Amino acid sequence: MSGHSKWHNIQGRKNAQDAKRGKIFQKISRDLYQAAKAGDPDPANNAQLRLVIDKAHAANMPKKNIDRAIAKASGIGGAKFEEVTYEGYGPGGVAVMVSALTDNKNRTASAVRSAFSHSGGSLGASGSVSYMFDRKGLIEILRDDLDKSEDDMLMDALDAGAEDMKATEEKFQIFTDPSSMTDVRDALQEQGYELDTAEVTMIPQNRTEVPADKAKQYRHLIDELTENDDVADIYETGILPDEDDDEE
């Protein structure tokens, strides 16, 4: 019995790791598509695409997955993909924006609407929550083995054209105007910095603490959206309560 239980636990951890890896690959695939679509599908002529490809390699993403995502952006394969955004409120009044990449808007809209409905949330009209977010360029640099003080990093970021910087224990987060993100990225790379992230994203102006009795529903909403193959990014204002780590 104990042997079966041990195998079950190991298998459960493996399944969880596989699911996590799948979500990482999904996000990288969307980033590859967007980078290739916004610029040249040849990484030799597209610095943003090279950065995402490096991230894909670091995550051990298979080459065929990388090539497939870039091929979609190049129009190879026939399907036409569109970027669409959905807005709504999740459990506890949390504002949620969903960015999707789809070849069938009806299918995607139905799936996103169902995810909100299943969790007790509601899908809203365009503009219903987007005003609660700021569109910003975000560049992240890991602090591991980086011999830089916060003040020195801030000065380098500002000299490169950044607007602001936030430091955590793990990384420096550098914020830019969306239109200047690529210029700041290039300037930092020229200074010798290795970038972990360089993208345009949506930053919440304020955070909403999810009530403890809504935490499970909120997590279900985010999980269901994340598992949707069409969903590229999820932006939300929610903060889960600390005590919502009780069940595995």
From Swiss-Prot:
Pfam families assigned to the protein according to its UniProt record, in alphabetical order: TACO1_YebC_N (PF20772), Transcrip_reg (PF01709)
Q: Which family does it belong to?
A: Belongs to the TACO1 family.
Location relative to the cell: Cytoplasm
Q: Which UniProt keywords apply?
A: Cytoplasm, DNA-binding, Transcription, Transcription regulation
Looking up InterPro entries in the UniProt record yields: Integrase-like_N, TACO1_YebC-like_2nd/3rd_dom, TACO1_YebC_N, Transcrip_reg_TACO1-like, Transcrip_reg_TACO1-like_dom3, YebC-like
Per the UniProt entry, what is one GO biological process?
regulation of DNA-templated transcription
Region annotation (Disordered) maps to: 1-22
Name by which UniProt lists this protein? Probable transcriptional regulatory protein Lreu_0552
Q: Answer whether the UniProt record assigns the keyword Translocase to this protein.
A: no
One Gene Ontology cellular component term attached to this UniProt record is: cytosol
A GO molecular function term, named singly, is: DNA binding
